A protein has these predicted regions:
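Substrate-binding/catalytic cleft of secreted carbohydrate-active enzymes
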Residues: 149-152, 159-407, 411-415, 426
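Secreted/periplasmic carbohydrate-active enzymes, especially glycoside hydrolases
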Residues: 1-164, 174, 178-182, 219, ...
Length: 619
């Protein structure tokens, strides 16, 4: 089934349904389509027969379009979903049926305004990641995908770029439901050897891959752009069909033609880096002066660039007609890639590795990429709040990040300097020492108080992209501990937000919290995330607690993983019931059985004990 919405407005929309019917030649076949609105109410129905003159065994049938008055449009804020029900009868008997969800929305791309959804300008504020889900690895669980999306959305993200393969069918369907825009990607390089793990050469089966991919995903309203490849214009062997010698342009045009055969409603792109035109890279002496975008970027319908956001204005001077999307941005430069962009004219940004993932670790004992804003457990680092200050400017924000100089990293990765400024919220340090920290804010100014004493007031420097919304406080006196409070104020001096961190005392208890205690389905696949935090007598997290935690569980669930959030540990996630806590925390992931029942979780650590009782529910 292929569902399109050729005309969309707040007052009226048309919905067109196309189906493929096989094995109909000797029968009187009728096809009926019924549309239901998000509440399940029938809002339209149409019937059609088969074409009279064709010898095709599998025939595409376009049913007459239906017009809906006052449609409920799909958007990030209100992801309204309709259902299209198709029933096929042969000689009066029902022989097949199919139901598909879809959304009513319009997409527009332009070099003048970037991207519009339903006629409204939207700047994509995205994440580009590999598809693993923390301790679960590449296993697909709906709850884990939804949890990740909701956490990103709560920090102002509205888009995810799939990298560098189609994600699960569940991923896009959950994005439909949650209201996350998706840039759907086919593959990495167009190579028969490198970056391709298939049993057959990529250039032999590309047509099958594209057809299967587009047909599977084309009804998803969350998907706004097809990405056909990534960082391939640097070697001819990565850029498609041998002998074309045009850095992928011919291959792209062929791929794009097949994409349009199966979906004419979306544009296509290819993410470009690290070469300029002619495959000139940083290793060539003319690189810094030769600001000509790669040939393929000038041929794609949307020009996607990874990194080098400071060169985009020069690219647009060379080719003003480019519709420009920053498909990867370095997290190490924080908000600079975001503020380097002309947000009125460009499509958006996707930070590479906003969430920690496995692989590309650079060094032992690290297991993956951790130059990120979110831990692989989805716990936010302080830098995530900096991103939130820009992604959600309407919400006053201030957040403290204490500098951990020993944890800082910086490496050259694929011609990009990447790394991380290690920050935390711990205020347990050596008496008499000094600590530097940042306050991240979108307010006019911040006052810092240490144990009630003012360290001064600093204004937010909004004139420089590399300093905006981040205020540095050097050598703040720790004394004997206590509290640090950041107070954010507007231009009039009125307090608009504050954040407080405190020195924790001795560990006395375990705080055990289930994330969705009343929503745990007994379907054999639903997950329950349980977060364990070691606290002192005042309920403050004890950051320097690293004792082992032991778990006992019984009831209608099974233990999937123990995850302390440490990206450097060599401890297992699975098949264990005890693990060292990290920064006083542990995440427990449980999976329901198929029968409803009670679940009891008993936890102990160095004399601290706690019990959590839950129930799974059969729908």
């Amino acid at each position: 089934m292929y569902i399109t919405t050729p005309e969309v407005s707040s007052s009226r929309a048309t919905v067109a349904v196309q189906v493929e019917v096989d094995g109909w030649q000797k029968h009187d076949v009728r096809i009926r389509t019924t549309l239901r609105n998000p509440k399940g109410v029938i809002v339209g129905s149409v019937q059609s027969g088969m074409p009279e003159h064709t010898h095709q065994t599998c025939t595409e049938v376009r049913l007459p379009a239906l017009t809906l008055e006052n449609p409920q449009l799909w958007s990030c804020e209100s992801p309204q979903l309709y259902n299209a029900e198709v029933v096929v009868t042969a000689d009066g008997m029902v022989v097949d049926s199919l139901t598909e969800q879809f959304g009513i929305r319009s997409l527009e791309f332009s070099p003048e305004f970037g991207f519009k959804l339903n006629g409204k300008k939207i700047f994509l504020q995205g994440n580009a990641n590999h598809h693993d889900l923390g301790a679960l690895g590449a296993t697909c669980y709906d709850k884990a995908i939804e949890r990740m999306m909701l956490q990103l959305k709560s920090f102002g993200y509205n888009c995810i770029r799939c990298s560098h393969n189609p994600y699960s069918d569940s991923f896009a369907r959950i994005a439909d439901r949650v209201g996350i825009l998706v840039v759907d990607e086919l593959t990495d390089k167009w190579s028969d050897n490198d970056y391709w793990g298939g049993r057959q050469p990529f250039t032999h089966i590309w047509h099958k891959l594209i057809t299967e991919w587009i047909k599977r995903d084309r009804n998803r309203p969350s998907i706004i752009l097809w990405s056909l490849g990534n960082e391939l214009q640097i070697r001819e062997g990565w850029a498609g069909f041998e002998g074309t010698n045009d850095w992928g342009i011919t291959t792209y045009n062929i791929f794009n033609q097949l994409v349009k055969r199966w979906d004419h409603t979306r544009l296509t792109t290819v993410a470009m880096f690290p070469a300029r035109a002619g495959a000139i890279t940083r290793h060539d002496k003319e690189f810094n002066d030769y600001l000509v975008p790669p040939e393929l970027a000038c041929a794609t319908e949307v020009a996607s660039f990874n990194y080098q956001s400071d060169k985009y204005d020069a690219y647009l001077k060379y080719r003003p007609d480019l519709i420009l999307f920053q498909s990867e941005a370095e997290t190490s430069n924080l908000l600079q890639p975001y503020y380097n962009m002309d947000k009125e004219r460009m499509v958006g940004i996707a930070y590479w590795g906003s969430v920690e993932y496995w692989g590309e670790s650079n060094k032992w004992p690290k297991k993956g990429w951790n130059y990120s804003f979110f831990e692989h457990t989805m716990r936010p680092y302080p830098q995530a709040y900096l991103i939130k200050t820009a992604f959600m400017p309407e919400i006053p924000e201030v957040h403290i990040g204490v500098v951990d100089a020993a944890g800082a990293e910086s490496v050259s990765w694929n011609d990009v300097i990447v790394g991380r400024m290690a920050l935390n919220e711990c205020w347990n340090h050596t008496p008499g020492s000094r600590r530097s920290l940042f306050t991240f804010t979108n307010a006019h100014s911040v006052e810092l108080l240490v144990n009630g004493q003012s360290m001064g007031i600093q204004k937010n420097d909004t004139t420089r992209a590399n300093l905006r919304n981040m205020i540095y406080w050097k050598d703040v006196p720790y004394g004997n501990g206590g509290s640090v409070v950041a107070i954010a104020r507007d231009k009039s001096g009125k307090e608009v937000a504050r954040h407080r961190i405190e020195t924790a005392g001795k560990a006395v208890a375990l705080r055990i919290e289930a994330e969705t205690p009343t929503d745990w389905k007994a379907d054999g696949m639903d997950l329950q995330y349980i977060n364990v935090t070691v606290i002192d007598k005042k309920g403050r997290p004890v950051w320097d607690y690293n004792e082992p935690l032991t778990l006992q569980m019984e009831g209608a669930a099974r233990l999937v993983a123990l995850d302390n959030g440490d990206h450097y540990t060599d401890e297992l996630f699975h098949g264990i019931t005890s693990k060292r806590m990290y920064q006083g925390r542990m995440q427990i992931i449980l999976r329901s059985d198929q029968e409803a029942g009670n679940v009891t979780v008993k936890i102990s650590s160095a004399g601290l004990k706690g019990t959590l009782r839950l129930k799974t529910i059969k729908e």
